[in-house]
Amino acid sequence: MEQTYQYAWIIPFLPLPVPMLIGVGLLLFPTATKSLRRMWAFQSVLLLSIVMIFSMNLSIHQINSSSVYQYVWSWIINNDFSLEFGYLIDPLTSIMSILITTVGILVLIYSDNYMSHDHGYLRFFAYMSFFSTSMLGLVTSSNLIQIYIFWELVGICSYLLIGFWFTRPVAAKACQKAFVTNRVGDFGLLLGILGFYWITGSFEFRDLFQIFNNLISNNEVNFLFVTLCAVLLFAGAIAKSAQFPLHVWLPDAMEGPTPISALIHAATMVAAGIFLVARLMPLFIVIPHIMNFISLIGIITVFLGATLALAQKDIKRGLAYSTMSQLGYMMLALGMGSYRSALFHLITHAYSKALLFLGSGSVIHSMETLVGYCPKKSQNMVLMGGLTKHVPITKISFLLGTLSLCGIPPLACFWSKDEILNDSWLYSPIFAIIAWSTAGLTAFYMCRIYLLTFEGHLNVHFQNYSGKKNTPFYSISLWGKEGSKISNKNFRLVTLLKMKNGRLSFFSNKVYKIDENVRNMIQPFLSIPHFGNTKTYSYPYESDNTMLFPILILIIFTLFIGFLGIPFNQDGVNLDILSKWLTPSINLLHKNSNNSIDWYEFCKDAVFSVSIASFGIFIAFFLYKPVYSSFQNLDLINSFVKTGPKRIFYDKIKNAIYDWSYNRGYIDAFYETFLTGGMRKLAKFAHFFDRRIIDGIPNGAGLMSFFVAEVIKSVGGGRISSYLFFYFSYVSICLLSYYFFNL
């Protein structure tokens, strides 16, 4: 066992040879490296699988013994300063390492087929492997300096992958936006680290927590300064985990390839902020008001993310705002002191969201056969619908992921979200009401995404999106935005929706190439017998087996991973593996808990939460089920269609909600106007001041001297006698002036 821990330092470095060898190969042997590109995918999966097995072994030891192992090497030592590097293996590390490796392996297998057409295939796998290395290094770090180093590496990898198709201006802009937004949080994190080092004199977690607790108990710290440093530390987590107000980069990050969206949203970048707060929890709980601030940011993000997801037409952006809201739940749980439920939801959400993103990638992949490579078309849910019979496996997987995120038992997210919702009542009734209401909104917008994507008819084939004449009721399902006709057999969309500002929104006919992309369709390294799709279709078709295999594995995780944390500990039977894994665990709301539950109370709370989720699902079915369904015969529908004061009021509310969601809560516009616009004006003023004032003064003096010299030269006429005359005249004038002024 001791030997297992001693070799744990190798965990972050096992995936590292792949990006290094790819880089060297592309520099020295580019032709051979590109011709053997499938080999690199196999090596990436193999090395990450070794890390997964090693992490599972560590996790088994953690569950059985609940031990914590730390090993450090002294790097810089002198009388005033010491810096040590090492690794820390505890329950949090083992949980995160398993999460990163399992999701990472499945995403890599999926990517082998998804990215097979792309000339950036090798670059993609190099970035992905380095991403895994950075995240594994982050979770095994034993001090704040290591945390910050790997924190920045995780950010670099995410920026590279978000802007992977950098030839598309929108992708390059999204990369810049993610970089600038995270710079704010990362600068705060750096200041917070330096502040706590100034207070405690240590970067190591154990020493930091012990010294700081002693200072707090002896009242030897300035609480205002300590709170400021804690807020700065938390700012890093706010940016990385897309919490309000630094959340604006997350939906734009969907410009990257879909597999990286799955990895970022499930187990890497956005999970890093949750991990940081969980790691620093012993520090935060002894600082007044910081826990309240964390929970406040969490509950704002929960509600904001849900409302912004209500009217998104891009399937990946809708899932991105869903991630934002679910991360808010985790941050809320950490702020409440419910450490276990936060990590439980991190686990269950990771597999469910990975399933949803890979499912959406399968849908996008199939839609590209109809609309070509154009994300504005292939990702637009308005053009989808009726995909059930075309992509049945993807449909079932997406439905299970949707129901899990909605909180329907016995799927994964039900157990963790229900635990957070129940704990919220113990913390604050106001927060609880918001959290429970948002659970209904979550069910609504997730079911909306599912219905627009898979139910009804394939809208791209019809002259309007319902397949029939437009009706007032169907405009409800598209938030009052009328459909328009599709031209000729090539399915080129002329006009999609009529926007609120009265302008028509056109899809660009320009289709960007993906890094000089040609679809060579090289066969993936993993081949599983499956009904193949080798023909060109005029309808979407099911994805290849290499893409379906990870989806099927994630279905298993979504079905059963929730049982990991069911707090069943009665009659000598202890099935609560997560509580044993996290022992000892921080829980400010259940300080005397014995990790068991009252099943009557549990069932009562579960019925309430499932009822709220079911209500959201019903509303989504009512509004988004196609008009040609059985609902059209209900008198209830007719009451909505009728005009009148109530109808006008309802339309105003509906349009206000649509405007809020479609315009991203006007937060991006606010930043663009007051921050970005203000900075640009300041930059222009600084440029003017530098060129006209700072440079203008010496340049003006030089010009004055030049012109005075030219005047004197012209008066003198080029004769020495004239120069001597003027010289003596000036000297005489100066002497006379000196004489008269000194009388």
UniProtKB/Swiss-Prot annotation:
Membrane topology: Multi-pass membrane protein
Swiss-Prot/TrEMBL catalytic activity: a plastoquinone + NADH + (n+1) H(+)(in) = a plastoquinol + NAD(+) + n H(+)(out); a plastoquinone + NADPH + (n+1) H(+)(in) = a plastoquinol + NADP(+) + n H(+)(out)
InterPro entries membership: NADH_UbQ_OxRdtase_chlpt_su5_C, NADHpl_OxRdtase_5_subgr, ND/Mrp_TM, NU5C-like, Proton_antipo_N
GO biological process: ATP synthesis coupled electron transport; electron transport coupled proton transport
Compartments, as annotated in UniProt: Plastid, Chloroplast thylakoid membrane
Keywords: Chloroplast, Membrane, NAD, NADP, Plastid, Plastoquinone, Quinone, Thylakoid, Translocase, Transmembrane, Transmembrane helix, Transport
Keyword Membrane found: yes
Origin: domain of life: Eukaryota
Catalytic activity, EC: 7.1.1.-
Transmembrane stretches, start-end: 9-29, 40-60, 89-109, 125-145, 147-167, 185-205, 219-239, 258-278, 283-303, 327-347, 354-374, 396-416, 425-445, 548-568, 607-627, 723-743
Main location: plastid
Pfam families per the UniProt record, alphabetical: Proton_antipo_C, Proton_antipo_M, Proton_antipo_N
Assembly: NDH is composed of at least 16 different subunits, 5 of which are encoded in the nucleus.
Function per UniProt: NDH shuttles electrons from NAD(P)H:plastoquinone, via FMN and iron-sulfur (Fe-S) centers, to quinones in the photosynthetic chain and possibly in a chloroplast respiratory chain. The immediate electron acceptor for the enzyme in this species is believed to be plastoquinone. Couples the redox reaction to proton translocation, and thus conserves the redox energy in a proton gradient.
Family: Belongs to the complex I subunit 5 family.
Protein's UniProt name: NAD(P)H-quinone oxidoreductase subunit 5, chloroplastic
